[in-house]
Curated annotation (Swiss-Prot):
Enzyme class, UniProt record, top EC level: oxidoreductase
Gene3D superfamilies: 3.30.465.10, UDP-N-acetylenolpyruvoylglucosamine reductase, C-terminal domain, Uridine Diphospho-n-acetylenolpyruvylglucosamine Reductase, domain 2
Species this protein is from: Xylella fastidiosa (strain Temecula1 / ATCC 700964)
Its job: Cell wall formation.
Official protein name in the record: UDP-N-acetylenolpyruvoylglucosamine reductase
Endpoints of the signal sequence: none
Keywords assigned: Cell cycle, Cell division, Cell shape, Cell wall biogenesis/degradation, Cytoplasm, FAD, Flavoprotein, NADP, Oxidoreductase, Peptidoglycan synthesis
Lineage: Bacteria, Pseudomonadati, Pseudomonadota, Gammaproteobacteria, Lysobacterales
Residue positions of the active site: 173, 246, 343
Family: Belongs to the MurB family.
Entry keyword Glycosyltransferase: no
Alphabetized InterPro entries for the sequence: FAD-bd_PCMH, FAD-bd_PCMH-like_sf, FAD-bd_PCMH_sub1, FAD-bd_PCMH_sub2, MurB, MurB_C, MurB_C_sf, Oxid_FAD_bind_N
GO cellular component entries: cytosol
Cofactor(s) required, per the database record: FAD
Pfam family, any one: FAD_binding_4
Length: 351
């Protein structure tokens, strides 16, 4: 970084390289990178002459973004990683975590405190701040089930706000924050975590993994370990093979259309959708049927372990990975008549 401006509450970097700040390890550079240590100083930092008026791009752990070009925005990172217990109740505990805390660290911390609810979401990359934007989910659980309050700076109103879970307007891999991307800067999230929680063991091999671990009466920490084992087998480690996890969302279709597809493709996995009239399809299955699993084109490719995961074998550019993703989606559309869309956020390009 060529130069930086330091204060006790925030640091502003000029011409900041972003390769180590995104898990695809794409070469990109931010004209300005603002790191927020204490979120209360956010209004002051945003009025600095170098960045005042610039659009803001919030970057958590960089685990759900693809830089197709250098960002034009001022890149903002929260580095507040504290977690505190706000209140104990008979059946639940309220917990507050800073936006910069790694999500998996929060899951492990909650289990160490004897709390439950987040165990199925173990090992998901990203930060606490990003979890509410994306409404992260895995193994039958979505984070919206446990979000109590989202604290954010409302850029439109110029003030800090506290939004309830209903005000966040959560949906499948979606939220108010995703639909209004330039309005809210999430600074912290409060979670309502139960003390006694019915474990969700009915999804994607968790029961089988617990059986392999010889656990007959599982506790939340056992479920978390099972999920960790499953994810490590299915998904490549970004520190070993650069990737951003699942690149595509599972498509949702009207139930009748999904059933018609299965008549032509009997092995097509179909899951319940968000409404009784809809179903969710496996994007991984659709992509694999089109022959993309394990494909490599230069340094851009599809992971051998999982067809939802695009990988950078070394020096692939964001534009090359995006071009590959578009070809994959086009082949699924042509063969099955189903549109698949990226779950990963695209920077410097439109889908």
């Amino acid at each position: 970084m060529s130069r930086q401006i330091n204060t006790p509450d925030w640091i502003l970097h000029a011409n900041a390289p972003l390769r180590e700040l995104n898990t695809f390890h794409i070469q990109a550079q931010a004209r300005w990178l603002l790191e927020i240590i204490h979120p209360t100083a956010l209004p002051q930092a945003l009025t600095h002459p170098h960045i005042v008026g610039l659009p803001i791009l919030v970057l958590g752990s960089g685990s759900n973004v693809l830089f197709a070009a250098d960002p034009e925005e001022c890149v903002l990172r929260f580095v507040n990683r504290e977690v505190t217990i706000l209140e104990h109740r008979i059946d639940h505990t309220l917990v507050r975590a800073g936006a910069g805390m790694a999500w998996h660290d929060l899951v492990l911390w909650s289990l160490q405190q004897g709390l439950s609810g987040l165990e199925n979401l173990a090992l998901i990359p990203g930060t606490v701040g990003a979890c509410s934007i994306q409404n992260i989910g895995a193994y039958g659980v979505q984070v919206e089930e446990f979000v109590h309050i989202v604290e954010a700076y409302d850029q439109t109103e110029g003030k800090f706000v506290r939004l309830t879970a209903s005000e966040c307007e959560f949906a499948y891999r979606n939220s108010r924050f995703k639909r209004e991307p330039n309005r809210y800067l999430i600074t912290a999230v409060e979670f309502r975590l139960p003390l006694l929680h019915e474990l969700n063991l009915n999804y994607a091999g968790i029961s089988e993994e617990l059986e392999a671990l010889q656990i007959t009466l599982p506790e939340p920490c056992d479920v978390a370990q099972a999920v960790i084992n499953l994810r490590r087998r299915k998904l490549p480690d970004p520190e070993v093979l650069s990737n951003a996890g699942s690149f595509f969302k599972n498509p949702h279709l009207p139930r009748e259309q999904a059933e018609q597809l299965r008549q032509h493709h009997p092995t097509l996995p179909i899951y319940p959708g968000e409404t009784p009239e809809s179903n969710k399809l496996s994007a991984a299955w659709l992509i694999e049927q089109c022959g993309w699993k394990g494909i490599r084109e230069g340094d851009a490719g599809v992971a051998p372990q999982h067809s939802l995961v695009l990988v950078n074998y070394g020096e692939a550019t964001g534009a090359e990975l995006l071009a590959l993703a578009r070809r994959i989606a086009a082949s699924v559309q042509e063969r099955f008549g189903v549109a698949i869309e990226p779950e990963t956020r695209l920077i410097g390009a439109q889908w």
